[in-house]
Amino acid sequence: MATRPQPLSVEPEGSADLLHGPEGARGRRGSTQKIEDLMEMVEKLQKVGSLEPRIEVLINRINEVQQAKKKASEELGEAQTVWDTLQKEVDSLHEEKVRLKDILNRKEETLRIMQLHCQEKESEAERKHSMLQECKDRISFLNNQIDNEKAKLRRLRLDFEEHLETLMSQHKDTMEFHKPEHLTEEMSVLDSSKEQLLKEEKLIKAKLEDVQHRLCALCGPEGSSTFSDGLFLRSHEAAAAMQMFKDENKKAEELLEAAAQQHQQLQQRCRQLQQKRQRLKEELEKHGVQILAQIQSTQKEEDSSWRTASPKPLEAHKETVQERPSSRT
């Protein structure tokens, strides 16, 4: 009777180390299943009692199982090699993942910084745009103000020129009408009329003395003077002489009074003309100083506005500077 074979439980070296991957686990499960099937078959044959006739079959089956196990071990080794390779690739991929994640974090941080920088740039651009708009509005306001000041200065210059022409024409007319020669002629005429009146007064006085002498001659001796005076005073000659004397005296007084009044009027008119001339001269100087002060203040305002304005106010300032010589002339 043949000896009972022992259960085959031999495992190849390194099989425990190879059973770490999914393919090694599948190969181990397959070989173990085959061994268990063989052991069950041996036990069945032992129970039946027909183990010897089929020993060769068992040996062949064992050889097949060993070859299958060897093949499974080779496949398991290849699978382990593939597993190691895949594990290395997984490790490298994990490292690559960590590296890419680090790069992604850095890129995200850079992106966040760039977004903040872009927001700052946009806010700066908006601020500059608002400042530019304010500068444009300020420049347009200053240009309008400069135009208004130029128009105001032009109107002032025209008014000053018109007033100056009026004053000059008035002064010219006054000077032409009241020249010193003309005043001298009028004074000489008045003096001559005064001398003539004085001569007439002397003649009238001489006539009065002559009349008095005649009256004295007509009176005669002193004893009969009262009677003779009464007769002479009641005569027509005395009445005519007295009337003539009164008329001549009245006429001389009127002429003298008219001459004195005319002389006084001429002197008063001469003083008025001198005062008017002095007043016109002072007014002319005053208006000239005011216009010059206004021009200087306008120039200062234009200079200050030119310093804060754009090239457009610079052109307006140049135009104003070009107009100044014509206004001064």
UniProtKB/Swiss-Prot annotation:
Basic and acidic residues composition bias: residue spans: 314-329
GO BP annotations listed: cell division; synaptonemal complex assembly
Protein's cellular compartments: Nucleus; Chromosome
InterPro entries: SYCE1
Region ranges (Disordered): 1-33, 295-329
Coiled coil location: 28-168, 194-294
Keyword field: Cell cycle, Cell division, Chromosome, Coiled coil, Meiosis, Nucleus
Superkingdom as given in the UniProt entry: Eukaryota
Pfam family, one: SYCE1
Any Gene Ontology CC annotation: chromosome
UniProt-listed PANTHER family: SYNAPTONEMAL COMPLEX CENTRAL ELEMENT PROTEIN 1, SYNAPTONEMAL COMPLEX CENTRAL ELEMENT PROTEIN 1-LIKE
Protein purpose: Major component of the transverse central element of synaptonemal complexes (SCS), formed between homologous chromosomes during meiotic prophase. Requires SYCP1 in order to be incorporated into the central element. May have a role in the synaptonemal complex assembly, stabilization and recombination.
Family recorded in the similarity comment: Belongs to the SYCE family.
Quaternary assembly: Homodimer. Found in a complex with SYCP1 and SYCE2. Interacts with SYCP1, SYCE2 and SYCE3. Interacts with SIX6OS1.
Protein name: Synaptonemal complex central element protein 1
Lineage of the species this protein comes from: Eukaryota, Metazoa, Chordata, Craniata, Vertebrata
Recorded name of the encoding gene: Syce1
